[in-house]
Amino acid sequence: VLEELLQRGHAVTALARNPGKYVARPGLAVVHADVLDAAQVAAAVRGHDAVVSAYNPGWGEADIHALFLRGSGAIVDGVKAAGVQRLLVVGGAGSLYVAPGVQLVDTAGFPAEYKQGALAAREALTRIRTESTLEWTFLSPPALLVPGARSGRYRLGSEELLMDGER
């Protein structure tokens, strides 16, 4: 997400617990902030046009479910406190429907190592749907995203999982 924003010429402020992990580049400002703290989020994003959140505490995090919900909630609260109106949240494919009334995260084949994070992302989506003071968008990337050459094409769906070969 960061790379795409920079390549498209956006000025980006990245919030990081460890700013030293980022390489200095044009258009990128790295701010030390803990996204679990709404006040720190608010201070970091105040004056921005929009916030793009790709928060995930890490798939290997033992308490990913609770941390994901705490962090996503603090981000929403911080964005609102800062007076930023636009929030784009990068979620996951788990909340997409694969059949009427069946979301991907609820299928038997959903990988166990991603289940708690996907359940938390779905809960975060449920929470943000009740938000009436922000202009928000929840983005669900593909279920499987692998490196490769840009095709210059993409497909948009709504709440259903898109698979290769479907038009």
Q: What is the predicted role of each segment?
A:
Residues 11-13, 19, 73-116, 121, ...:
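Conserved Rossmann-fold NAD(P)-dependent oxidoreductase catalytic core, especially the SDR/UDP-sugar
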Residues 20-81:
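NAD(P)H-binding glycine-rich loop region in Rossmannoid oxidoreductase-like domains
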Residues 15, 54, 139:
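The conserved SAM/SAH-binding core of class I Rossmann-like methyltransferase domains
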Residues 153-167:
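A conserved pocket-lining segment of Rossmann-fold NAD(P)-dependent short-chain dehydrogenase/reductase
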